[in-house]
Curated annotation (Swiss-Prot):
Major subcellular location class: membrane
Gene behind the chain: ugtP
Pathway per the UniProt entry: Glycolipid metabolism; diglucosyl-diacylglycerol biosynthesis
Domain of life: Bacteria
A GO biological process held by the record: lipoteichoic acid biosynthetic process
Annotated HAMAP family: Diacylglyc_glucosyltr (MF_01280)
Catalysed reactions, as listed in the record: a 1,2-diacyl-3-O-(beta-D-glucopyranosyl)-sn-glycerol + UDP-alpha-D-glucose = a 1,2-diacyl-3-O-(beta-D-Glc-(1->6)-beta-D-Glc)-sn-glycerol + UDP + H(+); a 1,2-diacyl-sn-glycerol + UDP-alpha-D-glucose = a 1,2-diacyl-3-O-(beta-D-glucopyranosyl)-sn-glycerol + UDP + H(+)
Family: Belongs to the glycosyltransferase 28 family. UgtP subfamily.
NCBIfam families hit by this protein: PRK13608.1
Listed name of the protein: Processive diacylglycerol beta-glucosyltransferase
Statement: the UniProt record of this protein carries the keyword Cell membrane: yes
UniProt-annotated location(s): Cell membrane
Enzyme class per UniProt: transferase
Length: 391
């Protein structure tokens, strides 16, 4: 329990929606705990430090799913010594030092890979407690921060990855990836589908265009899924792509087995009411799917963390990878015509999921911060030349 005034600084990043969603889940949970002595602040470090360059990098990141896959692949799978020579390791350093001296946090929580934090812990000898929430299912070197006291990871396999990389087992907690508590709540599937003017007796296929709406060819997929699985119905989530939503609505306006939606706050209800989901394997989306025990098909996952997530889920029997739309259509047909296989996949997910991840993480964070040093003890160790960066 926090009995003295304490402050948590959350460092996150807006490359995709997942890291921000994790941050918001944690902030919401801490706020619900009504801790009068605790303040929580969050910063999108890279965007605040270098807004123009980061905006360019974000556009490149989004487009990398379509045009620059090999470039991103080389970056993601580069060796640690190559990263050490890269400017990325020092990206945001001045801003981070400025934040630490200005805010004087009692604990730093990372919800985004932040290699620059390693520079502080290794070169500046700052010993503020650091905790990291990893938002994917396979470990990557960018998530490791020397002298970090806690890593919150998705599975025991992820923990083993960190141990193999040299992180002490006692620093790693298997909590699952934090998602909103509503994904733990019971949903009346029949009532929800009826409210949405869909048939509760039909298998429902949930399709998502992804956070950036970068995928195309959904009209072809929907037509062929219904042709090969005529007893099914399809719910298509277009995200923020208004053009995709408008196009698909026009094409399927007279088909009662197809529902086209834009951005929705009801992914929880749709996941709980569907038998199968076609999606990109972002860490948060598949964690929500795991919580709802809905088998998934990963369509042409991008090299890097998403492909590693897809490999992991496929190896565990939670989903299948489809390299092409036609392959995805065939997998849908096979699974919807084999109800027992879907049940087995859902059962494996039920056995493996870790519930109430956000609560577990917040409880442990409070324990960590309760044992943290006083700010005067910490900030007396900040080198004088570091103060040059304070604005």
């Amino acid at each position: 329990m926090v009995t003295q005034n304490k402050k948590i600084l959350i460092i996150t990043g807006s490359f995709g929606n997942g890291h921000m969603q994790v941050t918001q889940s944690i902030v919401n949970q801490l706020n619900e705990m009504n801790l009068n002595h605790l303040s929580v602040i969050q910063h999108d470090l890279f965007m605040e430090a270098h807004p123009i360059m980061t905006s360019i990098c974000k556009k490149w990141y989004i487009n990398s799913f379509k045009y620059f896959r090999n470039t991103y692949k080389r970056f993601y799978y580069s060796r640690p010594n190559e990263l050490d020579k890269c400017f990325y390791k020092y990206y945001g350093l001045n801003k981070l030092i400025n934040l630490l001296i200005k805010e004087k946090p009692d604990l730093i929580l990372l919800t985004f890979p932040t290699p620059v934090m390693s520079v502080l812990t290794e070169q500046f000898n700052i010993n503020i407690p650091i905790a990291t929430v990893m938002t994917d299912y396979r470990m990557h070197k960018n998530w490791i921060t020397p002298y970090s006291q806690r890593y919150y990871v998705a599975t025991k396999d992820t923990k083993d990855d960190f141990i193999e990389a040299g992180v002490p087992a006692s620093y790693i907690k298997v909590t699952g990836i934090p998602i909103a508590d509503k994904f733990e709540e019971s949903i009346d599937k029949e009532e929800w589908l009826s409210q949405q003017h869909l048939d509760p007796s039909k298998p429902t296929i949930l399709m998502s265009a992804g956070a950036f709406g970068v995928s195309k060819g959904f009209d072809y997929m929907i037509n062929n899924i219904l042709e090969k699985s005529p007893n099914s119905q399809v719910v298509m989530i277009c995200g923020r792509s208004k053009e995709l939503k408008r196009s698909l609505k026009a094409k399927f306006k007279d088909n009662p087995s197809v529902k086209i939606l834009g951005y929705t706050n009801h992914m929880n209800e749709w996941m709980a009411s569907s038998q199968l989901m076609i999606t990109k394997p972002g860490g948060i989306t598949i964690s929500e799917g795991l919580s709802r025990c809905i088998p998934m098909i990963f369509l042409n996952p991008a090299p890097g963390q998403e492909l590693e997530n897809a490999y992991y889920f496929e190896s565990k029997g939670f989903g299948k990878i489809a390299d092409t739309p036609n392959e995805a259509i065939d997998i849908v047909s096979d699974l919807t015509n084999n109800e027992e296989t879907l049940k087995v996949m859902s059962s494996k997910m039920l056995e493996s999921k870790v519930g109430y991840s956000t609560r577990k993480i917040c409880k442990d964070l409070l324990d960590l911060i309760g044992h943290s040093s006083q700010p005067d003890e910490i900030y007396g160790k900040v080198p004088l030349y570091a103060r040059f960066f304070v604005k």
